[in-house]
Structure formats: structure tokens, C-alpha cells
Amino acid sequence: MAKRDYYEVLGVAKNASDDEIKKAYRKLAMKYHPDRNPDSKDAEEHFKEAKEAYEMLSDGQKRAAYDQYGHAGVDPNMGGAGGQGFGGFADAFGDIFGDIFGQAAGGAARGGRGGPQVYRGADLRYSMEITLEQAAHGYDTQIRVPSWVSCEVCHGSGAKPGTKPETCPTCHGQGTVRMSQGFFSIQQTCPKCHGTGTYIPEPCVHCHGSGKVKETKTLEVKIPAGIDDGMRIRSAGNGEPGINGGPPGDLYVEIHIKPHSVFERDGDDLHCQMPIPFTTAALGGEIEVPTLAGRASFPVPEGTQSGKTFRLRGKGIKGLRSSIAGDLYVHVQVETPVKLTDQQRDLLKQFEKSLAEGGARHSPQSKSWFDRVKSFFE
């Protein structure tokens, strides 16, 4: 039988918010929960269907894949609608009902009807600060990150060498215990074995029964040219180890770009403030500016005013998703001279006098501004 559209299952629009999706799921789960419909196969199927839809649409990456490719874009085994029974109910509803039952929603492994389940390890995040030049050109580097690895003494079992884990007497190897409150009855992680289905009578002294030890490892990281602030680089399999033999999580290296002394980045474009002498602004000339690839020069026309912006095409950054480099925008600031000599003062006074004799043609903006002020007070 073909699967129904996940949005149709929850009864929400395709542009529904996360909160709307959660509310719709909660309503359906309360309506079709097996403990409220113990003899209804139809209710059981509706509950599984709603649970699968919620797990897909509440995850940003899975939802994006589903929106683009439909059911073919997501792994149906990740939905939890297969042979897990209802062992995943507490997982899916932990954030909604955790406060009702006094439990914290988390990633701890929960067992199912078929015994302890395997769980993928948690992802880790590493924050890396790089320069604008490194972001623009890319480079290879190494990072040292703390990591959990399998204990070499007990080979990950957590048990003292010569002994082995035993079946948990509390959950009888299931990894979960059932908890009831009012008309709700849900499965919780077993408090004795923490979801593994086994307990360790004689823990390994090296790892204290955890089966893993912490160590620092060195990883090679390739920073691609054009990366921007806030982007992440995925290092597959370098996260936390899995639970009950599950696959490890991933490490995400989050990039932060240091402020630059000259440039400000805006996407693929760069901006810089360039002071120029007032003589160059008045007479025009050639000025030289720095770029990430070296130096570049461009002509400044005579009569350039402070704040004028010049665009140098292709002198920005070629972003990760761009086929061409961005532009460099040079914002010129006309610099007023200071600490003048007497001779320089006299020359400027003569210059000022000549400007006054020339009238508005030398200072059109000033003339226009004074005219507006005059009309304002009339």
C-alpha cells in the first residue's frame, strides 16, 4: 500500500510551522494511542503513521529532503514505524510530555519489544576561528578534539576481564519499563540498565563500566575556499560512539571568521574604507587599494566627494556556491589636512578666496544646501 503524504497524515499545510506540526501530532497521538484503543488494529496503524510523519517533519533536514523528493528522499527505516512496536513513543514525545511525567527528554537509548535497540551516537560540535584570507583561499589544517573511544581493557563491554554483562533483572533484557499515569501508559528507559538490557556486576576498573574512555585525537580538516561565517564542515563518524553497537555520530566543525582590519564581508562582496587626500579628490588621480589577491588601482575623477563608492568587479570572494567572484566596493573618505604650517594656511586662505569669487560653480552642493536652508526659514 502506498504511503500517504506526511502533511496529509498530520492534517497540516506544507508550510506549517514546527509548533503546528507538534500540536497536530500530539492531538493524533492522544486519540490513537494503543493504551486508549487496546483492541483496535486501525488505531494502532494510525498511531504508527502519525508517529512516522512527525519524526520526519519535525527534523529540518529530513523535512527538506521529503519536500524535495517525497518518500523516496527519506529512509523509511528512520521513521520508527517498523518492528520497534511502541518503544519509541517516549522518544518521540519526550519534549511534549516530559514535564507531565517528570522525565527529561534526551537521547538515551530505549529498548523495544525485541530487546535492546542500537542507537546512533550523538553529533559533536567544534568551533573554529579562521581569518578572512583563509576563508577566501581555503586551506588544510589539523584540530585536536576530545573523543570517546572503546575501552581497550574490556573491549567496550564495560565488564571486568573474565566476566560479562548479565541480563537486567528489572526490565528482563528489554531495556525499558512501562510507566502509567492516568490514562497514559508509556515506556521509559530502564533506570537500572539505562536502556541496554544488561547490567554489569563487576565493572571494568579502567572505564568504570562505561565501555569507553576519553582521549584527544587529531583530525585533518579541509577548509574549502569561499566558506562563509557560520557554515559547518561535517566530519563523518567522528562524533560520540553509538549505543549498543550503533554507528558513531558525526563531528561538525563550525566556522567563525575573525574581523578583518581592512575589509568587511557581505556574502561574496567585500567593502573597505579608503582615505584619499583632498587634493586628489579635487584634482582627480590614480589611487591604489589592497585586495585579497594583492593590489589594484583605479582612477578617481576630479571633484570626487567624500562617501563616493567605487566598484571593482571580481575583486571580492568566490563563494562556495558561486561560479564567479564577488566585487570589492571602495568607499572613499576625503581626508581633511591637520597641523598646517603658516605657509599652508596662507595658501588655503588664498584658495578659499578664489573659490568664493567663483561662486556656486565650485561648490554646487553647498549652494544647493544653503538655498534649502534659506527657504526653510522663510
UniProtKB/Swiss-Prot annotation:
Zn(2+) 2 binds at C168, C171, C190, C193. Zn(2+) 1 binds at C151, C154, C204, C207. A zinc finger (CR-type) spans 138-216. Binds 2 Zn(2+) ions per monomer. Its cofactor is Zn(2+). One of its GO terms (cellular component) is cytoplasm. Pfam families: DnaJ (PF00226), DnaJ_C (PF01556), DnaJ_CXXCXGXG (PF00684). Residues 5-70 form the J domain. Gene3D superfamilies: DnaJ domain, Heat shock protein DnaJ, cysteine-rich domain, Urease metallochaperone UreE, N-terminal domain. CXXCXGXG motif repeats lie at residues 151-158, 168-175, 190-197, 204-211. The J domain is necessary and sufficient to stimulate DnaK ATPase activity. Zinc center 1 plays an important role in the autonomous, DnaK-independent chaperone activity of DnaJ. Zinc center 2 is essential for interaction with DnaK and for DnaJ activity. Belongs to the DnaJ family. Participates actively in the response to hyperosmotic and heat shock by preventing the aggregation of stress-denatured proteins and by disaggregating proteins, also in an autonomous, DnaK-independent fashion. Unfolded proteins bind initially to DnaJ; upon interaction with the DnaJ-bound protein, DnaK hydrolyzes its bound ATP, resulting in the formation of a stable complex. GrpE releases ADP from DnaK; ATP binding to DnaK triggers the release of the substrate protein, thus completing the reaction cycle. This is Chaperone protein DnaJ. It comes from Burkholderia ambifaria (strain MC40-6). The lineage of its organism: Bacteria, Pseudomonadati, Pseudomonadota, Betaproteobacteria, Burkholderiales. The gene is dnaJ.
